Amino acid sequence: MATITYTVTVASGTNRHGTGNKFYLNGTVSPDINLIEGNTYIFDQSDSTNDTHLLGFSLNDNNDPANVYTTGVTQTGTPGTSGAKTTIVVAAFAPTLYYYCVNHAGMGATAYTLSGGLTSETTTFEKTFPVDDVVEE
């Protein structure tokens, strides 16, 4: 299983929730992301712009109504300080999630969860198939 790190910053921007402060993941404003079950995702919130913007996960878009998702989620430190991060180890059969700011509405987006059967590795199958005719150009 893989570990993927997103650098989280906060700045003014526009997403499907409107304009205002937004989470930026690796420099992109509130992108929808894919989380593969079994993988670990670290949301590094040590940048000072994260102050007061703790990233969490919810079963509802924008956490409205509130339905916090905590399975496999660990929050470390205080956002905006060195070492601050939110980590999620994606559980088997995890539902579609939404990342959001626990203090302010409209900052996040969707975190689609995908089966751990998906990988970035290539599998080669070796099989001989009979050919009836050869087509030549």
Predicted segments, located by residue:
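Extracellular/periplasmic metallocenter environments
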Residues: 4-15, 25, 50-52, 71-121, ...
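N-terminal edge beta-strand
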Residues: 13-37
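Extracellular and analogous surface-interaction loops
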Residues: 31-39, 88-93
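Solvent-exposed, conformationally flexible loop/turn segments
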Residues: 36-38, 83, 137
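Acidic, Ser/Thr
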Residues: 45-49
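Beta-strand signatures of extracellular beta-sandwich domains
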Residues: 54-58
